[in-house]
Amino acid sequence: MNTVNLKINNIPVVAPEGATILEAAHLVGIRIPTLCYLKEINAIGACRICVCEVKGARGLAAACVMPVSEGMEVFTNTPALQRYRRTTLELILSTHRTDCLSCTRSTDCELQQLCREYGVDMNRFTKKDQGYHTDASMPHLVRDNSKCILCRRCVAVCQKNQYAGVIETCERGYDTHIACAFDMPLSETACVACGQCTAVCPTAALRERDDTDKVWAALNDPTKTVIVGPAPSVRAQLGECFGMPIGTNVEGKLVAALRRLGFDQVFDVDTAADVTIMEEGTELLHRLKEGGPLPLITSCSPGWIKFCEHYYPEFVDNLSSCKSPQQMFGALIKTYYAQKAGLDPKNIVVVSVMPCTAKKFEIGREGQSAVGLPDVDVSITTRELADMIRRAGIMFPELPDEEFDPIFGIASGAGHIFGATGGVMEAALRTVAEIVTGKELARPEFQEVRGIAGIKEAEYDLAGTKVRVAVTSGLANAAKLLDRIKSGEAEYHFVEVMACPGGCVNGGGQPHQSGDVRNFTDLRSLRAAALYSEDEAMTLRKSHENPVVKELYAEYLGEPGSHLAHHILHTTYVKRGLYGKN
């Protein structure tokens, strides 16, 4: 690798050729502030917060886009630069609604943090109300342009990572704003509800719809039995909201916190993930033996499902008819559990804690009501749960570790790894391989489908049958894979798709991390590692060996793929098209 020598703040630096000033400075522990930059996604130098002085240059250079060169001398924090950044922040604030005390991102806002760092405690510039309206037309998020700073992160992630491109930069000059085409509400676009825009927004211009009031109301209603289930990835991310290191598994504290919030039963959605594998594995074997649309494509990610319905409706028949683990969880609570506990399903409120904003959309879909009631009543994100814990005065890091309640409290390691890209595929392969061969796997790991690569492929020999599989995450990668399948360039039997790059660990509802962290930390790998570590430490690592799952089928469902299982655990999809029903 070729390198260049330069100086940053009089410190000698050896940086890779082609590196930016921002990256070179990071190598020697120098932080240059940014607001718009996202590594490999949004490098446009628009916010002007990262500008530096380069000796001999005519003007200031944006560190996020300026490549280093041999002999370059850079200064990142001179008095002039401090004044420049402060003025830039004041100008940004002149068009920003500063209701910081009541803002949902207060103390978690990148703009607020930079204003604090640069001493912006008052604004010299007159504010102007640009008359923007809040768009709350979708069930999963709220868009508030009065808090937009035009960093364009959302535009970049929607176009580059997620292929959808439903938001863009409109108008010019002072009238520039982020909007959908023709200023339409999101509900009239092909938005897939993934929430990646909310994950990268540095302010509260994009945020998930807050459904915590619905949960508080249920918890305070003595006529309701309120049951909660967190998704696999939540245990690996919730700790970040309370200052714990990225990738810390807080499962025990999560359970303790949910009990202290007042939930009547604290169950594990991972158990439903094991049920998903039983149903989806059976569906795969049926299509391989009896015929059916191939490849079978997973259906756990509601953002992916909506993307397929809008952008690739020709693949809708390839989708597994299995509900997602969230929806299976709710359906089983209101059928199987209600019968065992002697409860009227009408008096049960099922709350899910998800890494995903699209789950808010999913709970309102048609075909998600096993007993004529919504399978899941309320879905909140990891961030919303953290807010509830704070509001209740619960000191999360000091909580003891507790265990899930019985019946839906035992899950396999296969269920845990659902939260990482490739996890659903690996969990399915563990079960399908043993069913087909009749032999126990020497090792349950399928390393070929692990990792954060956008597209992964593998071929396995299952009792003489060659099974080709593919795993993809991020909808732009999914589009590439589907195009290859459609053209005949690639052929698979089984495909896993997750809407969010890296899978649920990088979901739109996960804890916010600043650009400083996102640009120089492998968030996805650190978070996924917590799930894989939990799996490796378990003796129960295969879905079909879960005693709760065995009992469920023996007592109630009969067998995977039975008529009753199809009624409760399976669903249908809609070919929406780009301009069809949202």
Predicted feature locations:
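Eukaryote-biased recognition of intrinsically disordered, low-complexity regulatory segments
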Residues: M1-I11
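Iron-sulfur-associated redox domains of electron-transfer enzymes in respiratory
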Residues: V4-N5, A15-L81, R85, R209-N582
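Short strand-loop junctions, especially beta-strand C-caps/beta-turns
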Residues: N9-I11, A181-D183, S233
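Charged, low-complexity surface patches
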Residues: V14, S137, K147, A190, ...
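Fe-S ferredoxin-like electron-transfer domains
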Residues: R48-A193, A199, L206-D221, T225
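Structural motif corresponding to the C-terminal cap of alpha-helices
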Residues: Q162, C201, Y337-A341
